[in-house]
Curated annotation (Swiss-Prot):
Residues 19-504 are lumenal. The gene is kex1. The lineage of its organism: Eukaryota, Fungi, Dikarya, Ascomycota, Pezizomycotina. GO terms for cellular component: membrane; trans-Golgi network. This is Pheromone-processing carboxypeptidase kex1. The chain crosses the membrane at residues 505-525. It is an enzyme of class 3 (hydrolase).
Length: 626
């Protein structure tokens, strides 16, 4: 009885509360560059105890504070593609070299904002869940993120009052507005003991947002870029598929669907019909490139990043739960397949107008060399969207905001267009992953969007202009290493908040110990009383109950005794109840193509697939919106 009581106590929420920021601190990272280590935290946070659902995060503290604190939550897409893409190939402070050493990203977004990368939904990247418990809809994705943030801010309260921005790319164009709406609703119904989360803006790059506007844009883009020539046999076949797609898009209820199978076949067939005699096809993420997988092995950094993240010492540095370090893959097609099994929620295009009208700024940006979520589709959805009393970029009826040419450090970079709290930026010569191609330009863009004031930071300003007019100063990658006076004041506030958080965690841990000792003492007292009545001696027999049934008293009790047995029992699952990310390197090598062999990712299909369609693209792969 006593053993079971103590196990119940240790598994209570109080024990979970005892976890603190210190448990997630990253002391060092393999291959780190010379110089002081950036302040980082990483690890798993439980979001669903019933399904063993845990989300992995990697957090980087900002290097400077410009007038106020900001946090950017970054999500990659898929669904089922890891946000480590964003951390190590796009906006994070490090890039991985061939020899697994890390170099600084000169355009990292952590210069003036805290960065929080989260692998989600559960089962993505380093996150995990029981294999029969993958998510199927966007509402559950948003609910898990709210749970994650509640727990994360409880451990890191110094960031809870930061201006909050949510950013990402591709299928995150669905995640981000749904999560933002959940935050807005939470703020409206806030409880007395909760803090308001100041959500300020959303940034979506080459996002999948509006099926009605973006499916037809695939063929439009192919014609515009000369991938397909109108009037040819290939064009006629594709036109027929597009006609069927258009019928589906206009069918009753189609406006509430994120995935439409018939429309997805346009891109699949386009890639098949344009494959060359030497088995090369267009890279759907960058049409300037061709390979046998249609972009599945792109970008080039993916190989070394995958090997790096599978290293045991990297997993240990990132505080991964036991057994979770070996199985990282960029995109988990089991997450993708399960997400497509049912109606996964309304398209995010239905949420954007309300979010903008509630005061949340939105920035959409596109690389003009991307096919799979191309800029024509994004421009079409903006043109047709109605919000704040107007349609598209109207400034007044019949008058649209102009496109303003953008130059960065003397080169034509793209253009800006803005109206009524929505900004659109087109990047010239950029792929699906714009920050991968142009980290400094995207840093300039994000600093302007989040209203960074660098007056007290120092460093030569970047030369960024719209229509030749010099913009307010930003300093991309050139800030001084010293901390400004504003930094010092805010640093003191952060340390005070951190100390309070650690104190709170310590108090919770002390409560656990006190209650545990009290319960233990009560049962010992009861045992002695019973022994006195029965005339027996309260010897070791009274203490045997501390151990679980069937566990020998001679088992080790050194620091890991009872607790380690409790963990082993709670973490053991039946052979059928495997965890989504719980496999080792040997198992990875034996996976079939349907289960993400090596570094290839499953091409994403917006809609369901037939079994006999597995070979539609790139030797059995469909394009991921990663």
């Amino acid at each position: 009885m006593l053993g079971k009581a103590l196990l119940l106590l240790l598994s209570s929420p109080i024990c979970a509360w005892a976890q603190s920021a210190a448990d997630y601190y990253v002391k060092s990272i393999p291959g780190q560059p010379d110089g002081p280590l950036l302040k980082m935290h990483a690890g798993h946070v439980e979001v669903d105890a019933e399904t063993n659902g845990h989300l992995f995060f990697w957090h980087f503290q900002n290097r400077h504070i410009a007038n106020r604190q900001r946090t950017i939550l970054w999500l990659n897409g898929g669904p089922g593609c890891s946000s480590m893409d964003g951390a190590l190939m796009e906006i994070g402070p490090y890039r991985v070299k061939d020899d697994h050493t890390l170099i600084y990203n000169n355009g990292s977004w952590d210069e003036f904002a805290n960065l929080l990368f989260v692998d989600q939904p559960v089962g993505t990247g380093f996150s995990y869940v029981n294999t029969n418990s993958y998510l199927h809809d966007l509402d559950h994705v948003a609910a898990h993120m709210i749970t994650f943030l509640e727990k994360w801010f409880a451990m890191f309260p110094e960031y809870e009052s930061d201006d909050l921005y949510i950013a990402g790319e591709s299928y995150a164009g669905q995640y981000i507005p749904h999560i933002a709406r959940a935050i807005v609703e939470r703020n409206k119904n806030i409880q007395r003991n909760q803090q308001h989360w100041p959500i300020k803006g959303l940034l979506i790059g080459n996002g999948w947002i509006s099926p009605r506007d973006q499916y037809p844009a695939n063929l439009q883009y192919a014609y515009a870029e000369g991938i397909v020539k109108e009037g040819t046999a290939i064009a006629n076949e594709l036109d027929g598929i597009e006609k069927s797609c258009d019928e589906q898009l206009n069918a009753p209820g189609a406006g509430d669907l994120v995935d439409i199978r018939q429309c997805e076949s346009i891109l699949n067939k386009l890639l098949d019909l344009t494959r060359t005699s030497d088995d090369q096809c267009i890279n759907v993420y960058d049409i300037r490139l061709k390979d046998a997988t249609c972009g599945n092995a792109w970008p080039p950094d993916l190989d070394q990043m995958t090997d790096y993240l599978r290293r045991a010492d990297v997993g240990a540095a990132l505080n991964l739960d036991n057994g979770k370090a070996n199985g990282w893959t960029e995109c988990n097609n089991q997450v993708t397949a399960n997400f497509r099994m049912g109606h996964n929620g309304v398209p995010s295009i239905q949420l954007l107008p309300g979010l903008i009208e509630s005061g949340v700024k939105v920035l959409l940006f596109s690389g003009d060399r991307d096919l799979i979520c191309n800029h024509l589709g994004t421009e079409s959805l903006i043109h047709n969207m109605k919000w704040s009393g107007g349609t598209g970029f109207e400034t007044k009826p019949g008058v649209w905001a102009p496109r303003r040419g953008w130059t960065f450090e003397g080169e034509a970079a793209g253009y800006y267009q803005q109206a009524r709290n929505l900004t659109y930026v087109l990047f010239y010569n950029a792929s699906h992953m714009v920050p991968y191609d142009f980290p400094r330009r995207t840093r300039d863009m994000v600093d302007r969007f989040i209203n960074v004031d660098i007056a007290n930071i120092g460093g030569p300003p970047a030369d960024s202009r719209l229509d030749g007019e010099k913009l307010p100063q930003t300093s991309v990658g050139n800030t001084t290493s010293s901390t400004s006076g504003t930094d010092q004041v805010d640093e003191a506030k952060l340390k005070d908040a951190e100390w309070k958080a650690y104190t709170k965690s310590g108090e919770a841990a002390l409560i656990v110990v006190i209650i545990g000792v009290s319960v233990w003492g009560f049962f010992i007292w009861r045992a002695r009383q019973r022994a006195a009545r029965d005339g027996t001696s309260p010897t070791k027999k009274g203490y045997r109950a501390v151990y679980q049934d069937g566990v020998d008293n001679n088992s080790s009790t050194d620091g890991a005794g009872l607790l380690s047995r409790f963990r082993n029992q709670s973490n053991s699952n039946s052979s059928r109840d495997l965890e989504a990310r719980d496999f080792d390197e040997a198992e990875l090598d034996s996976l079939t193509p349907n289960l993400q062999n090596g570094h290839e990712r499953d091409h994403y299909v917006i809609g369901e697939e037939d079994e006999d369609e597995d070979n539609d693209i790139g030797n059995g792969a469909k394009s991921s919106l990663h």
